[in-house]
């Protein structure tokens, strides 16, 4: 059984060397795993390929040291080439996360294989079109946001006019109802957001600074995980929910 068959995106950490306040990536990963995070993505818009590979290797070592290599996937953001190179160097990279303007998911799947995890993010209206028209068997989960504006990724949710469009709880609930794949939501998510976010029926949250920039990353990660576990319900048809 591959990780695709038992994928848990409920507590999703995104990090890179520029997000950890100078602390080792592996240390932040280890603390997040100890708190119960379930999936790790290495992302950097400033690292070259070799540096990103080294970062992935550090994260993979932390996952292995926690004994979680068979249940916590490690993904690379955007860079299919880095994921392939890391695998060639015997680094356990389990897949990639791409946007609709990045390498096509069909290409990612072809090169990484059937057991790899491929995640996709897009603007909400584009996600609707994708769900309606694309071969969803190629994708394992969908990333949606931002819930709030965020300095970590200021262009997240930006429309063609340069405005950042955040996602309402109603919109997230509607997307989850129509999606055949799990949905993870991020963009400035804090522990206080988790109860309402879980009520939408989405399958998880993703964070960067809430853990990576925290004075105590493990405590911050645990607060998020505990809030999710206390509020999430098994998705499916789910209850009818209202917000406000």
Predicted regions, residues:
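Acidic/glycine-enriched connector segments
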Residues: 103-104
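A short acidic, helix-capping loop that chelates divalent metal ions and anchors anionic groups
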Residues: 42, 48, 148-157
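Short, flexible/disordered intra-domain loops and linkers
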Residues: 154-166
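Non-cysteine beta-strand/loop elements that form the S-adenosyl-L-methionine
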Residues: 99, 139-149
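Short amphipathic secondary-structure patches
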Residues: 109-110
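Conserved N-terminal beta1-alpha1 strand-loop-helix module at the mouth
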Residues: 1-97, 114-125, 130-140, 163-183, ...
């Amino acid at each position: 059984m591959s990780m695709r068959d038992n994928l848990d995106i409920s507590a999703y950490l995104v990090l890179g060397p520029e997000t950890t306040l100078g602390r080792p990536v592996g240390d932040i990963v280890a603390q997040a795993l100890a708190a119960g995070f379930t999936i790790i993505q290495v992302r950097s818009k400033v690292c070259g390929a070799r540096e990103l590979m080294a970062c992935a290797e550090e994260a993979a070592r932390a996952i292995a040291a926690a004994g979680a290599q068979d249940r916590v996937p490690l993904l690379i953001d955007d860079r299919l080439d880095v994921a392939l190179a890391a695998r060639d160097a015997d680094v356990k990279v389990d897949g990639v996360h791409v946007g609709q303007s990045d390498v096509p998911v069909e290409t990612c799947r072809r090169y990484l294989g059937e057991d790899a995890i491929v995640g996709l993010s897009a603007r909400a209206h584009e996600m609707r079109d994708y769900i309606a028209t694309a071969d969803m068997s190629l994708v394992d989960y969908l990333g949606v946001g931002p819930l709030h504006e965020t300095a970590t990724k200021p262009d997240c949710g930006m429309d063609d006019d340069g405005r950042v469009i955040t996602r309402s709880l109603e919109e997230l609930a509607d997307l989850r109802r129509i999606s055949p794949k799990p949905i993870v939501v991020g963009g400035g998510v804090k522990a206080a957001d988790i109860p309402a976010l879980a009520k939408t029926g989405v399958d998880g949250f993703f964070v960067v600074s809430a853990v990576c920039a925290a004075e105590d990353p493990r405590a911050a990660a645990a607060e998020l995980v505990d809030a999710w576990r206390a509020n999430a319900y098994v998705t499916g048809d789910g209850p009818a929910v209202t917000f406000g």
